[in-house]
Amino acid sequence: MSRRRVLAGAASVALLPVAVHPARATPESMAAAIREAVGGAEVRPGRVQLEAPSLAENGNSVQITVSVESPMTGADHVKTIHVFSEKNPITTVARFHLGPRAGRAKVSTSIRLATTQRIVAIAAMSDGSCWSGAADVVVTLPACVESGF
């Protein structure tokens, strides 16, 4: 294979269309993800407390705790807790499935945040209602950075 042919091939590869992925989600894409997760049900504020640091020095590990006011009985319990981020490359951060045997509706985890943003937690209840809570987190050292985009 000649050098000329290799260079021509490399140039043609550079001209191929590249799939473009958004570097981060948007508030609109987060709203769409929430609608999809709750099946179009109305999401009301309240009953959900999202604890997160107001300032996170490192976006690679941000500790959050979500608790929901619920008696956690067979008739009235949290079925699912969804966590969404406004500006991460992927909007849905976490999903927890609970039942009455969980005892209490409280989950904790560490998440990665790409930048300063709002985090929203949605609790889907056994009666079909959905409740929300939110927290704003300022990130000084971002995570979730995808090179090449």
Residue ranges and their predicted role:
Residues M1-P17:
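N-terminal secretory signal peptides and thylakoid transit peptides that target proteins
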Residues R24-N60, F96-H97:
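Transition segment at domain starts
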Residues Q63-P71:
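Short edge beta-strand/loop segments characteristic of extracellular beta-sandwich folds
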Residues P89-R112:
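An anionic, turn-rich surface loop/hairpin at beta-sheet edges
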Residues A114-R118:
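Extracellular Ig-like/FN3 beta-sandwich strand-entry sites
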Residues S126-S132:
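Short acidic/polar inter-strand loop motif in beta-rich domains
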Residues D136-T140:
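Short beta-strand edge segments in extracellular beta-sheet folds
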